[in-house]
Design a protein with these regions (language model features):
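Carbohydrate-binding surface patches
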Residues: 31, 224-226, 234, 631-674
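Aromatic-lined carbohydrate-binding/catalytic grooves of carbohydrate-active enzymes
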Residues: 315-455, 464, 469
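Conserved, mostly hydrophobic/aromatic
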Residues: 31, 154, 280, 324, ...
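Bacterial Sec-dependent N-terminal signal peptides
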Residues: 1-22
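Polysaccharide-binding surfaces and accessory modules of carbohydrate-active proteins
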Residues: 21-35, 44-255, 271, 678-685
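Short Pro-Gly-centered flexible turn/kink motifs
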Residues: 103-110, 275-294
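Aromatic- and carboxylate-lined catalytic core of secreted/periplasmic carbohydrate-active enzymes
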Residues: 585-589, 593-630
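Active-site neighborhood of glycoside hydrolase catalytic domains
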Residues: 380-387, 393, 397, 419-579, ...
C-alpha cells in the first residue's frame, strides 16, 4: 500500500511539473475545470471549459489551438482569454485601447500566474503584458469548489506618458463549442420584473444591454441562463447561469462565429464611455459570476444561492427582520400619532420592525408629494415635530424596531439642496431639462456629492443610533447626461458615477457594518451581486399582486436566494384572499404593507399566525435549498419547496393560480428529501 501511495504521489507530482512546463493554468471547482494554456507565441488561450477532469494527466492533453475557421486562419490563434482589438481577431475584443501615438491595437502576452487560498476557495491571478506598449492586464479568478461557482474580473493599467483611452473593458471572455445554444434572458419594466424568455443563439451577435445609468436594470436584468443542445430546463440538461456585479450600464454579448462556436462577453456597456485612463491608474472591471450544472437550472440556482449566502451577500449567514411598511397605508399623509398607531399594529401583527417610507423630510420644500424635497434630509417639522427621536421612542414603546426610507442619490429642483448646489445634479447646461418622476440624479462622480450622500446616512445614525434599518431607493435613471464636475471627460460619467456609489456604500459599511439595508429602485431595477455586498436584501417589485409575484419571484430565484428577496403582503389585487397574498410573500423575506384595520378579525388572526409560522420556519426558507417544482410558465399551477440541508425539514408551497372546473390535478414530486426517512406532513396557514 505504501508503494502504491508513493507511486500515485509521484504521478501527481509529475503531472504538476508537466503542467507547469506546458504553461497550463487550471481553475477548478469540485465539478468544473477551466483550463488555460500559454501557446508558443506567448499568448493565453482557453483550452477547456467543462466538467471536472477525472484524470489529472488530462490537463496536458489539450492544445491552445482548438477550433479553426474554414480558411484556417482562426486555427493559428485559438480562443484567446483576453483578446485585444486592432490585430488579427475578427470578433468582439475583450479590451480596446487607443495609445498615446494613436495606435488602436493591443496584443497581450503571458507574464506569470499564481494561486492563493481565499475564503471559500482559490484565487488565480494571471499577469499579461503588451510587448510593444507599457500596458498590463491582470486577470483574477476565484473558484469556489463546494458551490461550483467561479468569479472573475480584470484589471487594466498602463505606464504611457499620457492618459490612454480605453473603449472596451470586458470582465472576461468564455468560449463554447456545441451544436445548439439557447439563451434565457430576463426582461423587465416597472411592475413587470424578471420576465423570462428563451431563444436560440444563431450566427452573429445577440446583445443584452442597458443605458439607463442609475436605475440600470429597469428594462433588462444583469443575468442570464444558457442551455446547451436544448433550452435550459429545471431538472435536466446542461445549463450555465451568469451574472455581472455592476449597478450601472452593463452589456452581455453572445457571439456565434463562422464555425458555430459561441463567445460570451460580460462587460460594462461601452456606450458613451470612452474612458481616459491615467498612467498607473488601475481600471477594475465588474465581477462576473457563473456556474454550471448537468442537472438543469435548479441545481445551478442552488449553487449560486449557497455561494451568495456564504461569501457575497451582506450578512448572508445572519437573520432577517419581518416588517410593516406604512407606504400603502398612508402614502405621504401621516403624522406622529398615526405612525405610533401603525407601530402598535406592527407589534400586534408580530413583525420585528416598523419601516417609515417616503414623505418624512423637507421644510422649505416639504415632501408632501414627489414634486419636492429630495435632497433636503431634515425631518419635516410640521408633520413630525418630535423628529426621528420621537419615532424611535414610539417604536420602542410599541416593542418593535424602527427603520426609515431614503433616496439619497436623487434631487428635486424644488429643494434647498438644488438652490445651493445646482451643479451637483447631472443635467445639460444648454438644453431643456427632462425630469423623470420630477427629479434629477446627483452626480456621484463628484467627491463632494459622495460626501453629501454618505452624510445622509451618517447624520441619521449619529443622531439616532437606534435606527435599525434603511430602505435605499433610486427611482430615476440618469437623464440629461452631462456632469458639470467631469467637464471635458464626459466619457467617464457612467462609470465613475457607479464607482462613486460604491465609494459611499463602502464608507457606510465600514462605519456601520451591522446596519441592514434594503436595495430598491422603483421596484427591482437594481439587482446585482456587487450592490448586494452592501445590502442585505432587495425589493423585487412594486407589483405585489400575488399572481404576478409568482412569476417575478420565480424569475429572480434563478439567481438570488430567498434571503435576498423582499416580498410584502399588500392591497394589490384585493380580489385575491389574504391567505394567497400572504403565502406568496412568505416564500421570500416576509413583510407587510397592509394596515390591520383593512382586515376583519379572522384575517387579522390569520396574518398573526402566518407571521408566527414564517418566523418558526424562516431558517429553512431563507437558508434551505430551494427546489422549483412546477413553473407558472407551464400552466395554471406553481410549486416551490425549501429543504433544510440536513433533509430533516422542508416547507412546500403549491398554488392553483387559475382554478378551472374539473381540471386535472397531477401529483407534485418532492425533491431535496431523504427517501429513507419518514416525514410528518402538516398543512399550515389555514
Amino acid at each position: 500500500m505504501k508503494k502504491l501511495f508513493v507511486l500515485l504521489t509521484a504521478l501527481f507530482t509529475l503531472t504538476q511539473v508537466n503542467a507547469q512546463e506546458k504553461n497550463v493554468i487550471r481553475i477548478a471547482t469540485d465539478n468544473t475545470d477551466l483550463i488555460l494554456q500559454v501557446a508558443p507565441n506567448g499568448r493565453l488561450y482557453q483550452a477547456y471549459l467543462g466538467d471536472k477532469l477525472l484524470n489529472e494527466k488530462d490537463i496536458n492533453n489539450f492544445s491552445p489551438y482548438v477550433k479553426g475557421g474554414s480558411d484556417g486562419s482562426v486555427s493559428t490563434r485559438g480562443w484567446e482569454v483576453y483578446p485585444g482589438s486592432g490585430a488579427e481577431d475578427y470578433f468582439e475584443p475583450a479590451v480596446a485601447i487607443t495609445h498615446n501615438d494613436g495606435n488602436p491595437s493591443t496584443i497581450l502576452r503571458y507574464v506569470s500566474s499564481e494561486q492563493k487560498a481565499v475564503a471559500g476557495g482559490t484565487e488565480t491571478v494571471i499577469q499579461l503584458k503588451d510587448d510593444q506598449y507599457p500596458v498590463e492586464v491582470t486577470l483574477h479568478y476565484i473558484a469556489y469548489p463546494k458551490e461550483n461557482v467561479i468569479k472573475t474580473w480584470s484589471e487594466i493599467k498602463h505606464a504611457e506618458k499620457k492618459p490612454v483611452t480605453i473603449w472596451r473593458y470586458a470582465s472576461t471572455m468564455l468560449y463554447f463549442s456545441g451544436n445548439e445554444y439557447y439563451l434565457t434572458e430576463f426582461s423587465s419594466d416597472w411592475a413587470k420584473e424578471a420576465q423570462m424568455s428563451t431563444q436560440p443563439l444563431l450566427f452573429g451577435k445577440k446583445v443584452i444591454d442597458t443605458k439607463l445609468g442609475s436605475r440600470a436594470a429597469m428594462h433588462t436584468h444583469p443575468f442570464f441562463e444558457l442551455g446547451f443542445e436544448q433550452p435550459a430546463q429545471e431538472t435536466q440538461g446542461r445549463a450555465m447561469l451568469g451574472t455581472i456585479g455592476w449597478t450601472g450600464n452593463f452589456q452581455f454579448t453572445f457571439e456565434v462565429d463562422n464555425v458555430g462556436n459561441l463567445r460570451v462577453i460580460p462587460a460594462i456597456n461601452p456606450y458613451a464611455s470612452d474612458y481616459e485612463l491615467k498612467p498607473n491608474e488601475v481600471f477594475t472591471t465588474p465581477e462576473f459570476i457563473f456556474t454550471f450544472s448537468n442537472n438543469g437550472t435548479g441545481e445551478a440556482s442552488r449553487n449560486l444561492h449557497a455561494w451568495a449566502r456564504n461569501y457575497q451577500l451582506k450578512d448572508g449567514q445572519g437573520d432577517r427582520m419581518t416588517l410593516l411598511n406604512n407606504w400603502e397605508n398612508t402614502y405621504f399623509k401621516f403624522d406622529e400619532k398615526l405612525l405610533a398607531e401603525l407601530m402598535k399594529e406592527a407589534k400586534h401583527l408580530g413583525v420585528d420592525m416598523f419601516l417609515l417610507d417616503d414623505g418624512w423630510f423637507g421644510n422649505k420644500h416639504p415632501r408632501n408629494s414627489d414634486n419636492a424635497g429630495l435632497g433636503d434630509w431634515e425631518v419635516m417639522k410640521s408633520k413630525l415635530p418630535g423628529g426621528i427621536p420621537a419615532l424611535v421612542k414610539s417604536a420602542k414603546e410599541a416593542g418593535v424596531k424602527f427603520g426609515i426610507w431614503i433616496e439619497p442619490e436623487m434631487i428635486n429642483p424644488k429643494s434647498e439642496l438644488f438652490e445651493k448646489h445646482p451643479d451637483w445634479a447631472i443635467t445639460l447646461p444648454n438644453r431643456e431639462t427632462y425630469y423623470y418622476r420630477n427629479q434629477l440624479v446627483l452626480d456621484l462622480s463628484n467627491p463632494k456629492v459622495q460626501d453629501f450622500v454618505f452624510g445622509v446616512v451618517d447624520n441619521i445614525l449619529t443622531a439616532n443610533p437606534e435606527v435599525a434599518f434603511f430602505k435605499w431607493d433610486c427611482n430615476s435613471p440618469i437623464t440629461n447626461i452631462y456632469s458639470p464636475y467631469l467637464k471635458n471627460k464626459q466619457g467617464q460619467l457612467y462609470i465613475d458615477h457607479v464607482r462613486g456609489i460604491y465609494n459611499v456604500l463602502e464608507r457606510i459599511k465600514d462605519k456601520y457594518p451591522n446596519v441592514p439595508m434594503m436595495l430598491c429602485s422603483g421596484g427591482g431595477a437594481r439587482c446585482d451581486y456587487e450592490a448586494l455586498k452592501y445590502f442585505t436584501e432587495f425589493w423585487c417589485s412594486d407589483n405585489t399582486d400575488p399572481i404576478e409575484r409568482l412569476f417575478i419571484q420565480w424569475g429572480f430565484s434563478q439567481i438570488f436566494p430567498a434571503k435576498a428577496m423582499d416580498a410584502h403582503v399588500t392591497s394589490w389585487n384585493k380580489k385575491t384572499s389574504v391567505k394567497f397574498r400572504t403565502d406568496v410573500a412568505s416564500m421570500c423575506k416576509l413583510g407587510f404593507d397592509l394596515g390591520l384595520k383593512e382586515l376583519n378579525a379572522d384575517e387579522q388572526t390569520f396574518c398573526q399566525n402566518a407571521v408566527a409560522n414564517w418566523t418558526r420556519l424562516k431558517k429553512v426558507i431563507l437558508d434551505g435549498d430551494q427546489y422549483r417544482l412546477v413553473s407558472p410558465y407551464d400552466g395554471n399551477h406553481m410549486s416551490v419547496m425549501y429543504a433544510a440541508p440536513d433533509k430533516n425539514k422542508a416547507v412546500l408551497y403549491t398554488y392553483d393560480i387559475h382554478p378551472r372546473f374539473g381540471e386535472k390535478l397531477l401529483p407534485v414530486k418532492l425533491q431535496g428529501l431523504d427517501a429513507k426517512k419518514m416525514y410528518k406532513v402538516k398543512e399550515i396557514n389555514l
